Curated annotation (Swiss-Prot):
Swiss-Prot/TrEMBL keywords: Glycosyltransferase, Transferase
Keyword Endoplasmic reticulum: no
Residues binding AMP, per UniProt: G167, S193, R194, A195, I196, T197, G198, T202, S263, K287
E.C. number(s) listed in UniProt: 2.4.2.57
Pfam families: Glycos_trans_3N (PF02885), Glycos_transf_3 (PF00591), PYNP_C (PF07831)
Species assigned in the record: Methanosarcina acetivorans (strain ATCC 35395 / DSM 2834 / JCM 12185 / C2A)
Function noted in UniProt: Catalyzes the conversion of AMP and phosphate to adenine and ribose 1,5-bisphosphate (R15P). Exhibits phosphorylase activity toward CMP and UMP in addition to AMP. Functions in an archaeal AMP degradation pathway, together with R15P isomerase and RubisCO.
Classification via PANTHER family: THYMIDINE PHOSPHORYLASE
Known catalytic reactions: AMP + phosphate = alpha-D-ribose 1,5-bisphosphate + adenine; CMP + phosphate = cytosine + alpha-D-ribose 1,5-bisphosphate; UMP + phosphate = alpha-D-ribose 1,5-bisphosphate + uracil
Family annotation (Gene3D superfamilies): 1.20.970.50, 2.40.40.20, Nucleoside phosphorylase/phosphoribosyltransferase catalytic domain (3.40.1030.10), Pyrimidine nucleoside phosphorylase-like, C-terminal domain (3.90.1170.30)
Sequence similarity: Belongs to the thymidine/pyrimidine-nucleoside phosphorylase family. Type 2 subfamily.
Gene Ontology terms: cellular component: cytosol
UniProt name for this protein: AMP phosphorylase
GO term, biological process aspect, one: pyrimidine nucleobase metabolic process
Taxonomic placement: Archaea, Methanobacteriati, Methanobacteriota, Stenosarchaea group, Methanomicrobia
Length: 506
């Protein structure tokens, strides 16, 4: 069947086309079936139907399909396509049967090529979430995710990297770790994510200082030139299957454990990382609530790294309260830059950054065992980390002379006050993050929260314990209402509650 194309200027995250019901009936296809579209290119797409959005003789195509045919001004040939063999692989996984390496390669390739529907992707995610995967299957999945995307081969070795499991607000340590490590002669090309559910991923933060979107070739050039990089991995086409899985996982609110392992390690493998430190924050509001779960995750990451030829060490870190006192892109970058400029900043930020950078310095041979943290702190104190950060900013197209005081935060502010005398006994990290997001972070770079009192600090009734920053007044109102309702910082006196006796006073 030959059909004219009509472009729907909408991105839906998959290859999908819209038939008029009459054309679909004539071709013998139903919603969810596949067709192959041939013009100057040939791709497969998933069928949907409509009675009136497109007329007979016309095929409605969304942006992901249209980009393959935007230079094609003739009708396209459309024929029914066979269901992908990956559907059978997914069924095997649902039936809790083992799968072969070639089957996983086929599955990942179909994910990248948009040959699977959201229903099929959801089934794959559900199967791995419920039944898990063997060590072999996780390794094969990781290798397939690496092989179906860009890879970078650096000329300088060893290649260092770090990753945080996340879940802790204010975790800006990469802005310190990368320049510390690079300043000591080690290569650390840090590809990072943007926030999905957080108030700012490392890429969102670095974007305050410089561009972060570069091709794989540009990342190599930048890192080789100055020893490090802080870039957004999404612009590199590294492990593209991961982004396609995340799109389906997000509305389901699940993150299958073994896919998480593969996702993390695929991104490290794609840049040729040889020594990797994993930050595993532990706490009730983090992704890893207990030390026991953290130890299991550490063992699994180390084992998978060994299978892939990577040396992986894990740091189980305190995650019950924010890192530093600022959450949100500009606020966090100001805090990190102050540490680089003068070592002024929260102890939690300095200590954690130095500890993780120290592990990398030891792994890379720049410091003797148990002396890495000392070297990391000295690199901050002597200004070498700041100088290296300026070089990275300049290499990525930013202003190397920018100072912490130059970074502007949201103009609209509101404070949350303590309702009683006492001490800070608890943080609800999830609500801290949500309040910062409601204020506009990470898209509004100046939005976020400033935390004035940390765990164990004394508070007087009426003290400001939290300040909300926003770039838009209506977002400030929304964040303030939520903060007042949820009470994300818990203050209690030494006397928590008085319980009277049976007879009371005589």
């Amino acid at each position: 069947m030959r059909l004219n194309l009509e472009h729907f200027d909408i991105k839906i995250g998959q290859h999908k086309v819209m038939f008029n019901v009459a054309d679909a009936k004539e071709l013998g296809v139903n919603p969810g079936d596949r067709v192959r579209i041939r013009g100057h290119q040939s791709i497969s797409a998933i069928v949907d139907t409509t009675e009136d959005m497109v007329p007979p003789g016309t095929l409605g195509v969304f942006s992901e399909v249209y980009e393959h045919f935007e230079d094609w001004d003739k009708p396209v040939e459309v024929v029914p396509a066979l269901r992908s063999k990956s559907s059978g692989v997914i069924k095997k996984m649902l039936d809790k049967k083992s799968v072969l390496q070639d089957e996983i390669k086929l599955l990942v390739n179909d994910i990248v090529e948009e040959n699977l529907s959201d229903v099929e992707l959801s089934a794959f995610i559900t199967a791995s979430y419920i039944h898990g995967m063997t060590d072999d299957e996780v390794e094969w999945l990781t290798r397939a995710m690496i092989d179906t995307g860009d890879t970078i081969e650096f000329d300088t070795h060893p290649v260092m990297d770090k990753h945080s499991i996340g879940g802790v607000p204010g975790n800006k340590i990469s802005l310190l770790v990368v320049p510390i490590v690079a300043a000591n002669g080690l290569l650390i090309p840090k590809t990072s994510s943007r926030a999905i559910t957080g108030a700012g991923g490392t890429a969102d933060l670095m974007e305050v200082l410089s561009p972060v979107e570069f091709s794989s070739e540009e990342v190599k050039e930048i890192a080789e030139k100055v020893g490090g990089a802080l870039v957004w991995g999404g612009a590199t086409n590294i492990a593209p299957a991961d982004d396609k899985l995340i799109r389906v996982e997000y509305p389901l609110s699940i993150d299958p454990y073994y896919q998480m392992l593969a996702s993390i390690m695929a991104k490290k493998g794609a840049i040729g990382a040889e020594n990797v430190v994993m930050d595993i924050p532990i706490g009730p509001s983090t992704k890893v609530p207990t030390v026991q779960e953290g130890q299991k995750l550490a063992r699994d990451l180390i084992n998978l790294g060994h299978r892939l030829g990577m040396n992986v060490e894990c740091a189980i870190t305190y995650g019950s309260s924010p890192i530093g006192r600022r959450v949100g892109p500009c606020l966090e970058v100001r805090e990190a830059m102050k540490v680089l400029e003068s070592m002024e900043g929260p102890n939690s930020l300095i200590e954690k950054s130095a500890a993780l950078a120290g592990i990398l310095l030891e792994m890379g041979g720049a410091a003797p065992r148990d002396r890495g943290k000392e070297l990391a702190l000295e690199t901050l104190r002597n200004g070498k980390a700041l100088e290296k950060m300026k070089q990275i900013i300049e290499a990525q197209g930013g202003d190397p002379n920018i100072k912490s005081d130059d970074i502007q935060v949201g103009q609209y502010t509101a404070d949350i006050y303590a309702s009683t005398d006492g001490y800070v006994i608890e943080f609800d990290n999830k609500w801290i993050i949500e309040i910062a997001r409601l204020a506009g972070a990470p898209n509004d770079k100046g939005a976020g929260v400033a935390i004035h009192k940390k765990m164990g600090e004394q508070v007087k009734k009426g003290d400001a314990i939290l300040t909300i920053y926003a770039e838009k007044e209506f977002k400030l109102d929304l964040a303030l209402t939520t903060a007042q309702r949820t009470n994300p910082i818990i203050v209690e006196g030494m006397l928590l509650k008085r319980i009277p006796g049976i007879y009371g006073f005589q």
